[in-house]
Amino acid sequence: PHPLTPSSPLLTQSLPSLKPTQPAALEKLNQGLALIEQGKVVEAIAAFREAAELNPQLAPAHYNLGLALRQTGELQAAADAFYQATQADPNFALAFANLGAALLEGNNLEQAAAYLSKAIELDPDLGVAHYNYGLALSELGKLEEAIAAFQKAMQLSRNAPEPAYHLGMIYWQQGKIEEAKKSLQQAIKISPQYPEAYYSLGSILFEQGDLEGALAAFREAAQSNSNYANAYYGAGLVFLRQNRFSDAEQVLEYARDLYKAQGISEWAANAEELLEQARNSNR
């Protein structure tokens, strides 16, 4: 699961009282923000670092440093920077939210949940914090709490399809099939280009024996992302069930090649096995 990041740079988040170094630190902070605008992330990182050194109490310097480091994939360094931002300003909800998101991405679940909970306490309307909190809780197996977090995220971030998708996945896990379908359909309604949601919906319909419905969902998944191997694999399962062996061969071959190209060897082997079944049945 990919945590979402609230990524708007913050310039003047509760600035501490002016110190002699402050103008220079602010100048460096502004320089860093301008560099981010120009797409010069590495140079921006250097400017934010300098701003933070000139004034360690300048929370936005640490915060924007964290965002920039996260952009370059330096998760641990990003988490450290967000942590420094929370130390400089203990009421900085977005810093706690991003700290939690970075820790979640690094699979540090307990700590992530604690910081996300703090972000929510500081700003109960931060939808992305509720969403990431839901992800952490579901990974920790706290499903009922995760459901509540995703529902809250859906209320607060009406244009984000991810909370509805993950809610659907939990319901499916719990065997609440109709609720699962409803949540996945909601995710698709918000974002009609959501291959994972179509695929999961197709899988549920397949399990229910609605082969045409499943096939339609797998087709939509493939149309949303033509490199999404699961969509072709799912279609292959439907075609096998329908005794449409030539069609099955075609999509399973495609799925196998995509899995191979994407380095997903286990599923490439599964597709190969089904492909053999299709070939043998087609003789």
List where the protein language model places each region.
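Terminal, low-structured helical/coil segments at or just beyond the last alpha-helical repeat
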Residues: P9-L26, Y233-R283
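Ankyrin-repeat and related helical/solenoid repeat scaffolds used for protein-protein interactions
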Residues: S191-E266
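TPR/TPR-like alpha-solenoid repeats
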Residues: A68, A102, A136, I170, ...
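Alpha-helical segment of the N-proximal tetratricopeptide repeat
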Residues: T21-P60, L67-E74, A101, E105, ...
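Helix-start (N-cap) detector for alpha-helical repeat units in TPR-like alpha-solenoids
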Residues: A25, A59-P60, A93-L94, G127-V128, ...
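Structural signature of tandem alpha-helical TPR/SEL1-like repeats
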Residues: Q38-E50, Q71-Q84, L94, G106-K118, ...
